[in-house]
Structure formats: C-alpha cells, structure tokens
Amino acid sequence: MDGILLTLVVLVLGISLAVVTSASGQSPVRISGHLVNMGLALVLMVLIANVPPHLLSKVGPPLYATGVILLVGVALFGEIRNGARRWLDLGFIAFQPSELLKLALPLMLAWYFQRNEAVLRAKHFMVGGILLLVPFLLILRQPDLGTALMLGASGFYLLFFAGLPWKVILGGATLGAASLPVVWGLMHDYQQRRVLMLLDPASDPLGAGYHIIQSTIAIGSGGLFGKGWMQGTQNQLDFIPERTTDFIYAVFGEEFGYAGAILLVCLYLAIVARGLVIAARAPTLFGRLMAATLSLNLFTYVFVNMGMVSGILPVVGVPLPLMSYGGTALVTLLLGMGILMSVATHRQLNKS
C-alpha cells in the first residue's frame, strides 16, 4: 500500500465530507449516503491495491467487452432521464455503463499494448484508436458530450504514453481544428447554448446562464479566507444548483475562500505527481501506461470541473473527483486509485 497516495486521498475525502455536510443542509440522508459510498469505495480500493498488476491486466478485455455490450443495451433499451438515454435499469439496480468504460478502456488499451510491446507498429495504434472510438461514439450518441470527451482524453493519454508518433498527433490536431465548424453544426441546441453562455451568461440569467452566474458569485464572495464552514449565503439560501455534485467546488470556494481553493488544488496536484512518480518507477509497460493515464485523467477531471464552475469552460456535467456526492463516480475513481497503489506495491512481477 502506498502510504503517501493513501494519505492524500483520505485528506481530500475528509474535506469532501465536510463540504457535502454543508451543501446538503446537514441532511442525514446525504451525509450517511456519502459515508457509505466512501466506505465502500475505500474497501474496494484496498482490495484492488493488493491484486498484482499482471492479474489486473487480464481483466481488461472482458471488462471492455462487457462495457461496450452494456452501452449498446443503453442505446436500445436505456432509460431516458433529463432528455438523455444514459441509464440502464435492470430492475434491482439502475446505473450508467459509461462509468464502467472509464476504467475498462485504459485497462483494455494497456493490456493490448503490453501484449504487443516487442512488435509495436502503426497498425497497433490503429487498433487502439478503434478500441477508443467504439465506446466514444456510443456515449456521444446518448448524448453525453462531457463523458465522451473525458473518455477520449483518457484514450489519447494512453496512446501517447504507448508511443503514438508526433506526426499523427499533430495531424489529428490539425484535422480536429479544421472540422470545428462541422462539429458545431452537429451539436445539440442546448450544447451550443452552454458554449455561448461563456461569452455572456447574463443574457439568460434565469436559464442557461444561471449555473455560471450563481457559482461565480459564490466563489468571488468567498474572498481570501471564505465565509466559514456552513456560513456560505449562496449555498445556504439555495442559489447554487447541484451543489452537492457538479457544483460542489462553488460551495467550497464560498466557505473556504481562495486560500482553501489553493490548498485543495495543491492536494490534487500532489496526487497527480505521486501517480506520475509511480508510473516512472513501474517495471512493466502495463503499469506505466495505467499509472500515467489514471494520473492525467484525475488532472483533467479536476481542471474541467473547476473551469466549468469558475465560468471559463462550458457546463458539461463533470463531477469534481473525490469531492462530489455520488456512489458510482466515487467507486470508479477509487478503483483507479487502487490500481495506482497496486502498481506501486507490486514492482516485482512477471510480464503477462
């Protein structure tokens, strides 16, 4: 078990519990639910941390196949919530299969590239691109642009660390920039409105601009040291939307100020740095790819959420890692932390 990483994770979870308590109005249901989610996620993290990476790598293909099948099931039989078909209801449980792909995709790609490590060619990167594209398009169809983009970033990180040539990266970036007008035309109306709201959220203060306006007021009013725990007026008067989930950073910023925000960012950066150290020390390609990708995934989620809440990025429904209320996202994230700890703990292993 990596003590440094574990300590950092527990510190952020402790802050999360305090902020969820405030954001929920001290709701016993929310607080107890968050404690249960944290307890379950931590137990699973410890269990995964004790599984050798070469065994974890074998989970990649079946987990990926299961995830893709479930995404197809969502497209055919999924439950529509808030205008999007993202949920699969099995009767005894309803869940979003896209969460499964956040781990299944990097596991699959890392397994594939380690398996072909000695003979890596352009065709292997093409196969990797296809493995990324299948779940990306299925999630984009739901539509869930935020999750699709995060999954795309995760796949790109892994391909990059596996040795994707720079000429391919630059060519892809040029093609992507040239196709922006086409992408804009394919976006749904509500997605276009979210982007346009960045320019002038005050043009629709009670509609599409409401989230950005209220969250930026909360963060700005927190000042240097904040208004104090459970003393945030924007929070307590119910102005901040989704304040226990996607916009929990606005609650934190209002109550703990810029000083608290800097501390939280430093904790996140420390987790990312520790993950990259683990990646550099990993003895196998699988371990290096997983550790580096999971670390940058965390950084991306934090950057996008904080940027979204601060009004510098569109609202895309991305939770703040380790902070936002929500069982599935927290379990998925701590399973990833468990994989990081597994790579750190089991340095002497056989290549699968």
For each predicted feature, which ranges?
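Hydrophobic alpha-helical transmembrane segments of multi-pass inner membrane proteins, especially
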Residues: 5-211, 250-310, 335-339
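Glycine/serine-rich anion-binding loops at beta->alpha junctions
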Residues: 91-101, 141-143, 223-228, 315-332
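Transmembrane helix boundary and interhelical junction motifs in multipass membrane proteins
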Residues: 144-149, 227-232, 243-245, 262, ...
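Long extracytoplasmic/lumenal interhelical loops at the membrane interface
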Residues: 223-259, 282, 286
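A juxtamembrane structural motif centered on a specific transmembrane helix
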Residues: 304-352
